[in-house]
């Protein structure tokens, strides 16, 4: 795969998703974002999209399996899932066509916009809109962004900020949303050769180390307060946004 041999890629996937798993264990999201950011140092963004999908799917399956009140989450957030799946089924077929630079630019710009609005003290949780409408709107945005970049946590985060949920509920629900989105993305990526058969062995290695990292991150998360939790999210997103925008315009 590109200029890397098997050992190199197994090593890169192991280290990358161990780090990504720790971040996901602490803040509930961030595994695909971290994975993409690190992998893009070694492979092009389109290849990174394919390698990213299997660790993302397995880690979020594990995250939702360990969630509280899974049936209640499914019932409460069903409209978000319907919306995200519908849009992902469309957008995931175009990831290979738009090019590596545009993938980086779209994602980095969206993340930076989110960080800026939060830094200006816009209180998302004070927005009063019917929840069903919010679910369809943010589910659709997640689907549009996620199919192209494989990174759909940003609209999910804004939606859950509006809901002003606890850190534990944030982790449980975001895991459910991302897991449900993985299935249509898998179909789109596999059909367009973004995800190839060769990638599965590397993806499974990444998934294994992501679960180890996730376990460690969970232990750290237990002592984090809600305000600190949100600050960690913003710091994390700022770093990723700058990196992706730089890649889009200067690589």
Predicted segments — roles?
Residues 62-69, 92, 97, 106-130, ...:
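Transmembrane helix exit motif
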Residues 9-10, 40-57, 101-111, 140-150, ...:
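Structural signature of hydrophobic alpha-helical transmembrane segments
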Residues 51-54, 79-83, 106-109, 172-176, ...:
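Hydrophobic core positions of alpha-helical segments in small-molecule transporters
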Residues 1-42, 124-174:
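Selected transmembrane alpha-helices and immediately adjacent juxtamembrane segments
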Residues 32, 44, 99, 103, ...:
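A helix-boundary/kink motif common to multi-pass secondary transporters
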Residues 51-100, 183-227:
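Selective hydrophobic functional segments
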Residues 37-46, 81-90, 114, 135-147, ...:
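Small-residue-rich segments of transmembrane alpha-helices in multi-pass membrane proteins
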Residues 41-45, 67-73, 161-169, 192-196:
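Juxtamembrane helix-boundary/capping and inter-helix hinge elements in multi-pass membrane proteins
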